[in-house]
Amino acid sequence: MTKKQKKMLLRIIIAAVMLAALYFLPVTGWLRLGLYLVTYLVIGYDILKKAGQGIANGRVFDENFLMAVATVGAFALAIYEKSGDYNEAIAVMLFYQVGELFQSYAVGKSRKNISALMDIRPDYANIEQDGKLVQVDPDEVAVGTVIVVQPGEKAPIDGVVVEGSSTLNTSALTGESLPRDVHEGDEIISGCINMTGVLKIRTTKAFGESTVSKILELVENSSSRKSRSEDFIAKFARVYTPVVCYGALALAVLPPVIRLVGGMDGQWEQWIYRALTFLVTSCPCALVVSIPLSFFAGIGGASHEGILIKGSNYLETLSQVRTVVFDKTGTLTRGVFEVTAVHHSDMDEQKLLEYAALAECASSHPISKSLQRAYGKAIDRSRVTDIQELSGHGVTAVVDGHPVAAGNSKLMEQLGIPYHDCHSVGTIIHMAVDGQYAGHIVISDVVKPHAKEAVEALHKAGVEKTVMLTGDAKKVADAVAAELGVDEVHSELLPGDKVDKVESLLAQQSGKAKLAFVGDGVNDAPVLGRADIGIAMGAMGSDAAIEAADIVLMDDEPLQIAKAIRISHKCIGIVYENIVFALAVKFACLVLVAIGLADMWAAIFADVGVMVLAVLNAIRALRVKK
């Protein structure tokens, strides 16, 4: 608990003890009134102060005003009737403060997940000067400076490892508990915790432009983007509160006047009591508090899972998504070419890969890199001579004295070497050694391990249609879509075509149905901005993705998309539950109070009880099912 919460709890305990003691103490008259007033001021002085400040600032109709009028009125009525029963006035204030404390605790609990994210903010950076480590403000570190990150410290700025190796804990950024190993030459993202070895990192960005700064700015600004539900409740409260105040005034005045006109006793005390009870019942705290809290808890729960939502308006829009459009590369596939098969080779597969990797050793093409990775050993260029790169065909070289050709079917035809066609999906590298066909190697963009499961999870989460956009050839795109179960695929698209295709898909949406576009943040900014909701995957370290997207997934796990949608559904469900429950109980109790069938204790339940239940329901949004 915070210092403020502890102080409030102490006031509640003191007031409760004093109220219980006064109930049994045989004191009467002015002494009794004085003791009850002291108890009332202990528990309610801050509410009276806020109500007074509100009146002075022209903001009369709020919950503080309602509580102040109701409790002061109850005191005045008890004094007028000389009943000495001041318990109800104090009980109303006491239980109201209990509700406020509970609400404060709930907000604090939901802030913990945001605070955990805020813990990624580094306090300092280590710079080596004259053989000693000096701590400096991260803002003062220039781009290109070598900083030292010791075990247990956070990486303060994005950079590249120039010395050392270690294991990083990225859970605060991605929600993923599995550590990541880094070595010399690997990129480091600010906010990660160094767990084992000492790392020397050359910074590639200024602190203000680093990943951690971008994320913190995003989270800090999320509360400023209100959902339609929050706007509705805020507008509703601005109209509702004055209406019920005037309604209470009418309830206190009109029935007695009508009775007097009819020649009956006005029963002023009875109707004023009902009006005061009406005010307590009508307090809109349950709605005003629980609705923003539900969204706040939803955003907090999502952030704990490595899902950063820029505002409650995006959370609300996400709950209405019925079409999810993927940019294939980097979302459903890894975007990295890998050797997936070796066919029709009488030669040992590893030997064929060795010939291919050595023949392609002078090329920086992604296909060449994938062959070298599949070979898995250091390339000895002294074994290779006479390398010739034939544009659009492949390469020829002499490896260990053997003529080697590696390329497409055109190269085989040019060399007059018979070859086998391949029906596998991917890029086919035909190999010839010593003028004889040696087989072919299949290279393709690898589908992510959980991509198929992610598409299925989206349908279970209420998504009606999944669409894949790609610049790949139709054969490749159709094969990936069929493997993953994607409903619709559009292939051979240029970057500009993707925006047009999303425009077309948006035009097909009906009613409140929304469209989400999922990209990896690379060249996706126009499409991310055009969709109803833009989701960037694997955005750790991508400034463009964090800027352009409405929702940022900090790792590249496609299952996170369905999880984000489930979080939004749960959050919006809680919001609607609270609205219906609070309004139903409020209006029912208001009617019962007006006709004299509910007293002040029923009003306390309608106010504090409903608020506590609504807040309890709201903090359910913090819990995210795995």
For each feature predicted by the language model, list its residue ranges.
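Conserved cytosolic catalytic loops of P-type ATPases
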Residues: 116-209, 313-356, 398-399
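Conserved catalytic phosphorylation-site environment of P-type ATPases
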Residues: 57, 63-71, 173, 273, ...
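Membrane-water interface of transmembrane alpha-helices in multipass transporters/channels
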Residues: 29-37, 60-68, 81-92, 232, ...
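Soluble-to-membrane junctions at the N-terminal ends of transmembrane alpha-helices
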Residues: 1-16, 34, 48-75, 216-250, ...
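Conserved ATP-binding TGD loop and adjacent catalytic N/P-domain core of P-type ATPases
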Residues: 401, 427, 433-577
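P-type ATPase nucleotide-binding
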Residues: 339-465, 474, 486-502
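Juxtamembrane coupling segments of multi-pass membrane pumps/enzymes
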Residues: 65-66, 91-151, 182, 309, ...
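Transmembrane helix-loop-helix hairpins at the membrane interface
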Residues: 2-124, 235, 242, 270, ...
